[in-house]
């Protein structure tokens, strides 16, 4: 990745509120499925803004900090996604998005950020990001990048 795009907590909340406004009325949704780990914080923000209490996760591993690696489903939410919003922070090359679409064909799949290769795979997103740009999310940073304590 040649460029970095730094996301601050306040910008993330602004983007999540914008996305939530597009998902109104909230009564049309049974719940939210957050893609772990990138979709956990955006999922919590959407749940708050939409007043949704039913929140589940699908746990998919496809990144090892700066590098993409093989996709692995660790845990999935039940059902085909009907009436659910599936949220991730980013759609990049589309590997995770394809898996999400296969698992939850009836879900409404949204992200905060979208790169060109993955854009056609989501129903909605807020911010366009160039394909060669790495996104630094606020939960991954202190003043400088701070690796997770577990090393994973």
Curated annotation (Swiss-Prot):
EC number(s) reported in the record: 2.4.2.-, 2.4.2.22
Quaternary organization: Homotetramer.
Protein name: Xanthine-guanine phosphoribosyltransferase
Pathway membership, UniProt: Purine metabolism; GMP biosynthesis via salvage pathway; GMP from guanine: step 1/1; Purine metabolism; XMP biosynthesis via salvage pathway; XMP from xanthine: step 1/1
Gene: gpt
Any one Pfam family match given in the protein's UniProt record, by short name: Pribosyltran
Cofactors demanded by this protein: Mg(2+)
Catalytic EC class: transferase
InterPro entries, A to Z: PRibTrfase_dom, PRTase-like, Xanthine_Guanine_PRibTrfase
Tagged with keyword Electron transport: no
Family: Belongs to the purine/pyrimidine phosphoribosyltransferase family. XGPT subfamily.
Gene3D superfamilies, sorted: 3.40.50.2020
Protein's UniProt keywords contain Membrane: yes
Membrane topology: Peripheral membrane protein
Principal subcellular localization: membrane
Positions of xanthine binding: 92, 135
Domain of life per record: Bacteria
Organism from which the protein derives: Escherichia coli O7:K1 (strain IAI39 / ExPEC)
Sites where the protein binds GMP: 69, 92-96, 134-135
Keywords: Cell inner membrane, Cell membrane, Glycosyltransferase, Magnesium, Membrane, Metal-binding, Purine salvage, Transferase
Summary of the function given for this chain in its UniProt record: Purine salvage pathway enzyme that catalyzes the transfer of the ribosyl-5-phosphate group from 5-phospho-alpha-D-ribose 1-diphosphate (PRPP) to the N9 position of the 6-oxopurines guanine and xanthine to form the corresponding ribonucleotides GMP (guanosine 5'-monophosphate) and XMP (xanthosine 5'-monophosphate), with the release of PPi. To a lesser extent, also acts on hypoxanthine.
GO CC annotations, alphabetized: cytosol; plasma membrane
Amino acids binding 5-phospho-alpha-D-ribose 1-diphosphate: 37-38, 69, 88-96
